């Protein structure tokens, strides 16, 4: 059976992510209809793949001028169901859009990007909100005003009155890119990993989010020996990896156990491609300020 090393890349604004792993020719054949539920290990891999996709979307749309938003509830206003919390998040998005239009105008409102999750841990966990917000093109003073707006609009209308009352506490903190990239020393998956750590989560987003661009895969760039070297003796050698990607600097190198980063649902025959490690890199264009591990 033919097998080779694949390099798969995504452009995410000033960042690029790269996955390097072994594939076989059978994995290019058309996938049939799913016949049985995925194994626990496959579900974990699917979750991690979804987390990486979301991290790429965050990198493509939000930067240090944006905000990481957390909204919690006072006990009196805690939703009875997850769907009620989702409705609160939808209402919050609608209020933020309307407030940005009123204050900054429709032109600026077109640059408003929101990606907010209703989350909880288990059926008995407390419902709350996490996510990202940014309005491009604002001055420093306008960003401070936008931040205050984000914190004050986590509220609801008082029935029978033209007044509002807060649902609880809402904090809008400046985005720390080291936390987004997972290089702040608090877990390699960073803020996105924290959001995905909740057992139940659902996202509400504005429609103007930029999707990361998937680049053409390279199937002849890497040998098995080179991948093994990169994942072992050069795993923490940024200079070695940067020689492989001119014009980019390494932000993070993650080495995964065999089949952990990429795995087909069909079992692989015994062979080197099922036992070799896999690598996932986050790179940053050199013209931007350095973010080192």
What are these regions (language model features)?
Residues 1-127, 135-293:
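Right-hand nucleic-acid polymerase module
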């Amino acid at each position: 059976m033919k097998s080779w090393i694949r390099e798969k890349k995504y452009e995410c604004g000033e960042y690029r992510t790269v996955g390097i792993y072994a594939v076989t020719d059978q994995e290019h054949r058309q996938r049939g209809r799913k016949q049985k539920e995925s194994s626990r290990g496959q579900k974990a891999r699917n979750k991690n793949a979804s987390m990486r996709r979301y991290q790429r979307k965050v990198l493509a749309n939000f930067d240090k001028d944006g905000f990481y938003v957390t909204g919690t509830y006072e006990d009196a206003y805690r939703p009875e169901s997850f769907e009620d919390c989702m409705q609160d998040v939808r209402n919050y998005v609608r209020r933020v859009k309307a407030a940005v239009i009123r204050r900054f105008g429709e032109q600026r409102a077109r640059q408003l990007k929101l990606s907010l999750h209703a989350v909880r841990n288990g059926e008995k966990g407390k419902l709350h909100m996490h996510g990202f917000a940014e309005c491009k093109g604002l001055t420093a003073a306008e960003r401070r005003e936008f931040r205050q707006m984000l914190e004050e609009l986590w509220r609801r209308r008082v029935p029978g009155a033209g007044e509002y009352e807060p649902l609880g506490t809402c904090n809008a903190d400046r985005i720390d890119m080291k936390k987004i990239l997972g290089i702040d020393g608090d877990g390699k998956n960073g803020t996105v990993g924290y959001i995905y750590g909740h057992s139940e989560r659902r996202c509400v987003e504005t429609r103007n989010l930029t999707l990361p661009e998937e680049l053409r895969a390279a199937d002849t760039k890497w040998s098995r020996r080179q991948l093994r070297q990169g994942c072992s003796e050069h795993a923490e050698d940024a200079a070695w990896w940067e020689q492989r990607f001119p014009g980019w600097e390494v932000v993070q190198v993650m080495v995964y156990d065999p089949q952990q980063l990429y795995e087909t649902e069909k079992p692989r025959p015994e062979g080197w491609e099922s036992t070799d490690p896999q690598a996932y890199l986050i790179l940053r264009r050199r013209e931007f300020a350095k973010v080192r591990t």
